[in-house]
Amino acid sequence: MYGESFEVVDFQNSWMMVRTVFDDYEGWISTGQLHEVLDISQEKLPSEKRILCSSLTNISNILNHSLWVSFGSEIQESDKISASNLVKIVPSFKFSSNQLSAKQLVDNAQLLLGTPYLWGGRSVFGMDCSGFVQLLFKAAGIALPRDAYKQAEKGVTIDFIEEAQAGDLAFFDNDEGKINHVALVIDSKNVIHASGYVRKDAIDHHGIFNQATGKYTHKLRIIKRI
């Protein structure tokens, strides 16, 4: 994601294995997609003020160069940069619900409806189910792990789907019992999730029901309130 910092774990030809500061997640990126930071220490990075983009945003700098960046991208606070659709300044992210707004989560989820599915993606150019959820909570000031099964370890368990509220997370498992999908609850009967694309579907105690096909697509395992 644009503006996120990381450390290099491995290097092979024109590819780097990196570990992100935000969630300690590892993956490969092309060396053409990074810029080395020389004027800030690693210890200072987490406390640096960031402006978070609330939609697909065009940023421009003092040299009149512009760049489109995704919802959830981080821009270092600077009087040399201007942009529209900025949500707020976030000095750090913690596992805390103090800044959490259910309406904010649902509103942002609806903005992303129709975004194509991309395994490993977490931007408006393509995202998977856990990347979608992580991005929503990041914009609300909440740090969640990258993978669905780790996200399911956070929060408080809600016993019944009828008790679910907007902003809760519904998790689903496969035939082996492993959690492999997550969706944002928008009310006790509907969720928004990334499956083929970011979409709205019905949910009940069995799982996600696709009204177009008349079939259940994901089996409900647990509901959590972060």
Description of each model-found segment:
Residues 117-166:
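Catalytic cysteine-centered active-site loop
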Residues 2-5, 12-14, 20-115:
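Boundary regions of SH3-family modules and the immediately adjacent low-complexity/disordered segments
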Residues 42-57, 135-151, 186:
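Short, basic/aromatic beta-hairpin or loop at an interaction surface
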Residues 122, 173-181, 194-201:
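Active-site loop architecture of trypsin-fold serine endopeptidases
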Residues 36, 158, 186-226:
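Aromatic- and glycine-rich peptidoglycan recognition patches
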Residues 163-175:
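Hydrophobic/aromatic-rich core segments of domains that either
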Residues 19, 181-186:
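Short beta-strand-centered aromatic/proline hotspots
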